[in-house]
From Swiss-Prot:
Functional note: Auxiliary component of the CatSper complex, a complex involved in sperm cell hyperactivation. Sperm cell hyperactivation is needed for sperm motility which is essential late in the preparation of sperm for fertilization. Required for CATSPER1 stability before intraflagellar transport and/or incorporation of the CatSper complex channel into the flagellar membrane.
The name this protein goes by in its record: Cation channel sperm-associated auxiliary subunit delta
Alphabetically ordered keywords of this record: Cell membrane, Cell projection, Cilium, Developmental protein, Differentiation, Disulfide bond, Flagellum, Glycoprotein, Membrane, Signal, Spermatogenesis, Transmembrane, Transmembrane helix
One cellular component (GO) term of this entry: sperm principal piece
Amino acid sequence: MLMLMLVAAVTMWLRPLVTAQPLCRARTVRTGKVFNVIQDVQGDRLYFRSTTTRLIKHPCKKNIALYLGKQVFFTTDNFETSLLPFTIPTSMQVGVPEVTSAHFTGSLLLLVVNHKVYTYDYESNSWNLSLGIKHPVTHVSGDNCCYTGSLFCVDVSNLVFAYFRGDQISQTYIYYSNTGGFSFWKYHYDRQAEIVGSLGGIFHLFSLSQVGMLVVDQGKGMFKYSDHPLNRSLGLSFDYNGTLDIVIAPGQKGILLLWFEKSLLFSRNAGQLVDTVRVKKGEQTLFTSIFEAQITIHNIAVNENELAVITREDNLYYGNLGIVPSSIIKFAHQHIWSEDAALMFRSSGILEILTPVRDTAFAAFDFQKCLLNIQAILMDPDLHVGRCNIEFLKGEFTYRMYTIDMHSQLELTALLIPQPGTSLIPLVMVSNPHSLGFQATFYESGYTSDGNTKYKLDIYLKQQQHWGRTDFNFTSSLKRATMSTLTVDIANKEISCVDIKPLSTLISVGCDLDKKIVIQNTVSACSKGVLDALALQDNYSFIIEKEFYDPGFQGRQSSKDLHVFYSYQQLGCPLLVYYDTPWKPVVELWKKDRFQEVVDAEYVLLEVNGQFSYSYSLTAKSAMCTSQPQNWTTMIKESGGPFFWNRENYVSCHDPNNDAPLRWPDVQYQILGGRTANQIVFSHNNGFYVFYISIVDPYYSYCQLETVFSIYVYGAFPVQLVSAGVVMVLLISSILGSVWLAYMIPRLLRTARGRRMTSFVAQLYGRCKTVCQFRASATARTGSKPMGRHRSS
């Protein structure tokens, strides 16, 4: 009994010690300080005027970050060295060096300083003023795509907005950049002058393929979107108390955090639905909002799946950005806050509290760093956190980017294993259901070595429009390339599953860059012996006569002949085409080095040298056009040059929505392929043609499929100067004349005149024979030796 009482007493004594264990152990980073070396701050010191701090990490380069507070610090090693305050060169003449916003794009840091945008290239340590901004701005916004080797991702990261937060939307100036912030242009939002309210922010919401504008009016906030189908109405309104900062969580999942000192809001679908973040303890909801909990936020940190909040009440809160309504739990109360403290996630489940420390002897600041292991903290039984119910969650598609082109599909697979005695509820989500649809199958796939059940999740994805299950008013435009993020998570996942991250991948519903078109060339001019391949490779050239080409592509004769060099390396041996047979190329679609199909979509041809000695077999009327068709003349005039007729500006004359009247039904129909049997008809000329081909059907592929190829037209003999009828009359006349002479000459010879003529011919023949014999005998006597001396033997 005494022993039991002793154990109980020791337990009660130890319990406060256990709960009093610090959340983290602090260490101070102090480097590069030598007493005989004096460091001086060069330039104008930047500062951030706010009672709260910001710590902005580069989403793709994890060691690069910017700290915004009373002092501004920029690091390339995660603050593992002492740093001088961040400055801007005095030569930039910024005036008041106050920073109001910052954003990373590639190797650039964009800073809004005194209402202007500056770029700092940290790789070359150079500053520049962004071009094109003519009015004051306060904020920049953008996103970063971290999938390497993708041109699409580069484009995403280069798109930036600059704007003045709080301005009336109808009167404000918004700027955009597609160069990563080097240059900006005015952005014209559709019907902007009619929008009532102030500007809370404008963002590229790539998870929805929309531009989203936060409209603030009468204490309410609503997101307005740029494109169909979301542009017909505003998102649901939410309370807008104070000035909210908007944080776009990394990963293009559509997760937004909106916060200021007394409010923390959360959206999973890029602002369409915005809800408060709840405060929970175990499964119990203590408060439905931060405002209700009466806490004051000092700083927040966000990564792809996690959220951390530090408050002025010296508390730390943590939550995951899961599928269920977002919530946070409160960690044990300890002294961790200071007015300069800021949070950042070092990695999944590893949180760091960073505090700059002033050194009285040196200009460089040290950094106090307090590292927290979230998984270890969640083991505290006082938090009432359930045990993780997932043993394994994996998919080969994570950290990869996929492309679904027009009429394509994608199949992905995930493997799930629950903890023994538990069950899982898998959930598959796409961030942009307006363009990407899917079908998922969940089934048992075997057992582990310890008898636990394995499950497999098969996911089939294709364009939402091709599933046939949605209304037109729900889907986005099929012609417009979009993107979406696929996420696989567990609906009943515990917050303790810190190391079990959702499976996520980025899917571009757009151009597959591996696709190309090739012109079938089974019968070439070289294989038939018409041309010599070696000769074509030896600086071969040909002449286009001035009557048959126009450098302006308007079908007018030129003033001089054109000398053209033939590029065998680019064109190879030309396709052989007989002049008198209507023709069109056989277009093949290839993906990398594999043949896919013969293209039956609509396309256009243009001779690159301006030759116009060919026509089309169909007219607008015979092609059954219901509206006036486009042609090269009008397209060149509209675009200002050739080779700009493509899927973006093509309008079919068979489209019922095309209201251009059919005024000239007899004009040539210059589109080949598709529903018509249109072909090229060549004039009576042999020679080379070098064609540019462009697939203009907007529903065949999101790619601009184009190429250049050559043909050689043969078989056109020189044009006869006399008509065939005249030749036939002359031939028949000569035959009849010969027959008549054969009949009449014998009859004439039997007459007296005929006998006299016969005698005359005989005498003439005898005289000629005598003269010839005399000349022959004279030549024989003289010999054959030339004049001069000759040695005899």
